[in-house]
Swiss-Prot record:
Pfam families: tRNA_bind (PF01588). Residues 103-211 form the tRNA-binding domain. This is Uncharacterized protein MG449 homolog. GO terms for molecular function: tRNA binding. InterPro entries: NA-bd_OB-fold, tRNA-bd_dom, tRNA_bind_bactPheRS, YtpR-like_sf. It comes from the Bacteria.
Length: 234
C-alpha cells in the first residue's frame, strides 16, 4: 500500500512529551517521512512540517493543555513506549486538518519470537529470523548474548523511533540485512534496566502490541518478563 511517496508499512507516529525540559509541549514524528525536505507552517499553538509529497512529517504542540483534554495524553509516553492511541491520533488529525488515522493502527513495538539465530563468523553477532505473527518472517541482526531460538522478545520495526529519538532504519550489518531491532529494557527506557534483550514469557501472544502488554502488566512486571539473569546487551 502506498501513501504518497512512502511505504505506509514504515510510517509510525511517535510522540515525545519531555516534561523535564519542556513542560506542556508535545512533539510528533512520523518515522520514514523524515528523509524528505521539510518546510514549516505555524499556528498559534502548534507547528507542523510538510514534505515534498505534501505529507505531514512531524508536528509540535506548544501548550497541550489548550489543545487536549485531561487524560488523553497518557503518562506512558514518559516510559519510552511513545506511540499514540487512536483517540489521540483522531484529535491530532482534527487540529492539524490532516488525516493521520490510517497510521494509528501501525504498531512499531511488537512481541516477536526468534525462530533462528545463526552466529556470524568473526563477530559477536547473530543473524536472526523472527516471527511477528504475520505471514513473513523478518531478518534481524542482533548482538545480545541472550538471543536464542524460541525466545520471545520485543521487535521495533523499521520506521519506529526509540525513546532517545533514534529512528530504526533498514540496515546492512556485517553483510546481512537487518529489518528492525530487538530491544533491551534500557533501549526502551524501562525499569528494571537488565542487560540483554527483553525476555518475554511464553504465554504472551506473538504479534501483540508491546505497549498493550506493558500497560496491562506494568505493575506486575514479572507477569510478562522473564526474571532470569541476563548477560551483556546488544
Amino acid at each position: 500500500m502506498r501513501y504518497g511517496f512512502f511505504d505506509i508499512s514504515q510510517d509510525f507516529i511517535t510522540i515525545f512529551c519531555p516534561k523535564k525540559t519542556l513542560k506542556n509541549c508535545m512533539f510528533g514524528l512520523i518515522g520514514s517521512r523524515t528523509q524528505a525536505t521539510l518546510r514549516q507552517e505555524k499556528n498559534q499553538n502548534f507547528s507542523f512540517f510538510v514534505n515534498e509529497a505534501n505529507e505531514i512529517a512531524g508536528f509540535n504542540f506548544f501548550d497541550i493543555k489548550k489543545s487536549f483534554r485531561r487524560g488523553l495524553i497518557s503518562h506512558h509516553f514518559t516510559a519510552g513506549l511513545n506511540y499514540p492511541s487512536l483517540k489521540l491520533v483522531k484529535k491530532i488529525s482534527e487540529l492539524l486538518n490532516y488525516d493521520l488515522t490510517p497510521l494509528a493502527k501501525k504498531v512499531p513495538f511488537v512481541v516477536c519470537e526468534v525462530i533462528s539465530a545463526i552466529p556470524i563468523p568473526n563477530t559477536h553477532l547473530k543473524r536472526c529470523k523472527v516471527n511477528t505473527g504475520s505471514n513473513k518472517s523478518l531478518d534481524v541482526v542482533c548482538g545480545a548474548d541472550n538471543v536464542r531460538v524460541g525466545l520471545k522478545t520485543v521487535l521495533v520495526h523499521v520506521g519506529g523511533v526509540l525513546p532517545d529519538g533514534t529512528i530504526i532504519k533498514k540496515a546492512k550489518i556485517a553483510g546481512y540485512d537487518s529489518m528492525g531491532m530487538l530491544c533491551s529494557e534500557k533501549e526502551l527506557n524501562l525499569k528494571p534496566k537488565n542487560q540483554g534483550i527483553i525476555e518475554i514469557k511464553s504465554h504472551i501472544k506473538i504479534g501483540k502490541s508491546f505497549l498493550d502488554v506493558y500497560l496491562n502488566n506494568s505493575e506486575k512486571f514479572s507477569a510478562w518478563v522473564s526474571t532470569k539473569k541476563r548477560v551483556t546487551g546488544n
